[in-house]
Each structure stands twice: as C-alpha cells, then as structure tokens.
Amino acid sequence: MSQVRSPFVVVMGHVDVGKTLLLDKIRGTSVAYREPGMITQHIGMSFVPWSAVEKFAGPLVDRLRLRGRIWIPGFLFIDTPGHAAFSNLRKRGGSVADLAILVVDITSGLEEQGVESLKLIQSRGVPFVIAANKLDRIYGWKSVENRPFLFAVEDQEWHAVATLEERIGKLIEELSRHGIDADRYDRVRDFSKQVPIVPTSAVTGEGIADLLLVLAGVSQRFIPRERLQVREGPAKGVVMEVKEERGLGVVADVILYDGTLRKGDVLVTASLEGPKEARVRMLIMPKPLEEMRDPEDKFMAVEEVKAAAGVRVVADGLEGVVAGSPLIAVWDPREIPNACNLVKEEISEIRIESDKEGVIVRADTFGTLESIVLFLRQQGVPVRKADVGPPTHKDVVEAVLSRRKNPIYGVILAFNVKTPPEVEKEAMSSGIKIIAGEILYRIFDEYIKWSQEVRTKTIEQILSQLTRPGKIQILPGFVFRRSDPAIVGVKVLAGTIKPGVTLVKDGREVGRIMQIQKTGRAINEAAAGDEVAISIHGDVIVGRQIKEGDILYVYVPDDQARQWLFQYRQYLREDELKALEEYLKSRRK
C-alpha cells in the first residue's frame, strides 16, 4: 500500500534577493494556520500543509476555483536556499526536488547567480515558478500585510501599476534571452509552454498566497502522481549534510523520499572510497512547536521516520560520508550487497576517471560535482576526471597528461574546495592552471577566457615555426653586387620575407636571404609593398640564375604548405594566400 507525499520545493536565486526571508514568511504561514498537533518541522525542511494554505489564502482559493481540487498534502520546503542544496537533492536519473522557486529581485532583474540557478533547474528538468520579489519597493505601491497579489494590484494607483508592468516586461525580456517564455501568472494561458511569474514581497507577505497556489497548480499539472507515491519498506533518501555534533559524534541530515527509516537499520551510503555501511543508533526530529517549552530543548528521539521527511541520523560508520550521497536502508542483511552495488553504480556515474582528453573537475559534494559535469558537457567541454574533495597530486599529473593532447585541457576546475598549498605549488611548477571559486558560471567564464588565451598563444607558437609565404620582384637598376653574396633591391609584391628564408625561381631554389636592409638599416622582416635591399647567400649570380625583373617566391616546405592550406588558412592574409597558391603552381610546372 502507498500514500502520496508532499512535493519537495527548493528556493533558488541571486544573493540578497530575499530567498531566506521568503522562506521565513512561508514557514510563518504554516505555523500560524496549522492544525493543532500537526508536525510542520523537520530537519532541514519545513512542511506547509495544504489545509494551512487554504486557510491563509481562502478568498484567493475561491477566486481561482481551487477549493477541493488539490490532492497533494502540502509542500516540503528545503530550509537551505541556493544551488548547493538543489544539487545535493539528487538521485539517479534526476532530482529529488519536485519543484523550484526562482526568486528574482523585481527592481534589478535576473542577476548572475539567478542565471546560474535557472540553468541548473533546467538541466535537472524540474518544474519551476518565478517569484518576482521586493514588490513593496515599487514606487507608490500600497502594501497590506499578507494580501494576495491579485487583490493588491486592483487597489493601486496607475503609476505604481505602470512601474510594475515595466519591471515585469524587462524580466520577461531577460528570461527570453535564456530561452524561457514567461508571463505574469494570471496571464498565462498554457502552463506547459510558459513559466508563471508571481510578484511577491517577503517583507509584507503580499503575493505569498498567490505563490503557494501557483505552486500547487504547477505540481498537480506536471508532477506525475506515481512520483509522489511513498511505498512501504526500507527508506531511500539523500544525504544533505554531514557534521560533528557534540555528544553525538558524526551525524547526517537526511531527506527521505521513500519508505521508512527505523532505529537499528543498516544504511548503505557513499564515501570517497565507495559504498559505506552504517547502523542507525538514533533518529532525531524537531519537537512539535507547542511542545517546545525550552529553546535549548528543540529535538526529540523517535523510533522510526516515514517519508517524506527530513531527519537527523546518528549512526556508527558515518565518518567520511559525502553530502549528495544516496542513502538506502536495508532491513534484510542479505540485501546489503545489492544495496552496495546500487550505490556504487550511482556514484560511479558521477565520478569520472578516463584517459580521454578533457579537464579535471573537483567539487565539495556529489551533488555539485554532478551539476558541474552536466553543465560542462552541455557547453561542449569534455571531462577527463571528476571527483569529490580538494585537488591532489594525481590530479596535477592527470592534467599534465591531458595537456599533451590539447593545451586547453591542462587545467583543474575546483568548485567550493580549497587546494592544499603543496598541490598549488606543484601545479604552478608544472604549468597547470587551477581555477577555483564558489560560483559555477564564474569558474566556467574564467575557464573560457583562459582557454582562449592558451589557444591564441599555442597557435602563435605554431605559426612562428611555419615559413610564411612571400613573393618578391628584383628591381631593375638595383643590383648592388652580382654574387657571393648577391645584393639586390627588391619589392615585396605579396606576403612576407625574413632573413633565413630560401628563395625559389620557377620551382628551383636559388639561395637564402642573409640580411634585409631598408634605408641603410637592417630589419627583421619586410611585408607587401616594402622596397628593400637583400643579400642572397648561395651559388647564385645575378645575370645568370636570376635577372633584374625576375619574380622569386619564398620556399615553403610541402608539409608546412599543407598546414597553411588545411589548418591555418584563416591566419594568412589574402596576399599571402595568393603568393602561396602561385608558389605551389610554379612548383608543379
């Protein structure tokens, strides 16, 4: 037998857009309108029952004709906003998160981390709603505590509504540049094609009712009922955080999305070494609010916890467990090997170790590692190795090997991890770049900028080893010496000439340029249009092998000619390309 759980909701967005305040306001709604004795608190998340939403948003529920039509029990809001929590809410083939709220500052639009959040939500295929927050900052807006937006907008002066429309219009434009078709939620005709924008104020509570009702509508429209069904049996979940608790030792904050977790259960989860077993000693949940007499006494031990829930697990063997790891409870000891295999398969899909060319990636959790690798692949950046934890000596070695295949892959991308000083020093001495940071898109942008610089430098080095094509004509009346070396005045008709290049006439080599002079001074090269004097070393006499008015070409070895034509053609000027083609034609005569 199975029951339907509440969908998990994650709040995301740029720093200072009001994510935490919005969550606080939503939680406050739950506390104020909950049924007596109802547990709304979990470890790491908060339950907002639908009954509380109906009470809070009563008139709007009736206006939108939603009363009696919502079958979800409520919402489970993840308490930690941001991309790290969203990334760790991972499971094989997708995300544990069922819904996301992308919070945007209505006064400043879509900002850097907002774009990052948007891309992350899209990459996991999670339905989302946009909260256009800070509605109370619209000039002239008249606020009323907790009023639904649809009622509030009807009570505003025209200039406040005009400003709001302008801000929403700009936001819609910004979103369209990222491939998102969005509109104010009451104007959306097809929720399968458009993303709803709900104007909100986390300060006054305006629009919170609308946001919760739109979330309910989106969840029922886009989340299959089977996804929210919780089965009887051992628990499945994901580790959100692992930490040391005084008096308890290492504990794990876990979100359960299926089954039941009991005291004494064997758990299979993951460390950097692979699958790891642990045995539950204690399960900790927050006390119901009405039982919290003492602020220091917020928690209670329980015998079992049913999904969906957030629970603190005290267990022997949690040392080294990594956030973002899958968690499988085992009731039958014979199932432990099977659970270990499932965990091993799941984390091996995230961790990458190959001999292919690509960058090295390091991240703080399995969840963020998976998100980064997914994003890099979408951007066409191959990954040679990806793992959890700080960069190591082995990573530097791998980056050096990868660089041999392609210089732009001689790099380590480190997300939210600190590089040990000795590894940093080794990377520097090996010429390996480490790009570190806490914002994925900044790391990526820095990598793209660096790789372009490396590509340019590499091409410059290659081109400097190639002989550039050139075409010259011996100027009549400017023979200064006939031989040993011959010194003549020439005009560069196309391309470039430099000391050291060999000259060719009618496909035959006639000698090598020793020196180039212009107005009595030695120069390193002469380009098309220049008239210069050159000395030619070799078995050449002016009047025999070469004559005044002759056309000579710079000798370009066959392999280099092929490189110019098929690999580096775009780096030749038009006159150089023409000179090369004429030279090759003269060789075929």
Swiss-Prot record:
Region (G4): 133-136
The family this protein is said to belong to: Belongs to the TRAFAC class translation factor GTPase superfamily. Classic translation factor GTPase family. IF-2 subfamily.
Annotated PANTHER family: EUKARYOTIC TRANSLATION INITIATION FACTOR 5B (PTHR43381:SF4), TRANSLATION INITIATION FACTOR IF-2-RELATED (PTHR43381)
Region described as G3: spans on this chain: 79-82
Gene symbol of the encoding locus: infB
Function in brief: Function in general translation initiation by promoting the binding of the formylmethionine-tRNA to ribosomes. Seems to function along with eIF-2.
Chain positions covered by the region annotation G5: 201-203
Pfam families referenced in this protein's UniProt entry, alphabetically: GTP_EFTU, GTP_EFTU_D4, IF-2
Gene Ontology terms, MF aspect: GTP binding; GTPase activity; translation initiation factor activity
Designated name of the protein: Probable translation initiation factor IF-2
Organismal lineage: Archaea, Thermoproteota, Thermoprotei, Thermoproteales, Thermoproteaceae
Species name: Pyrobaculum aerophilum (strain ATCC 51768 / DSM 7523 / JCM 9630 / CIP 104966 / NBRC 100827 / IM2)
Ranges for region G1: 13-20
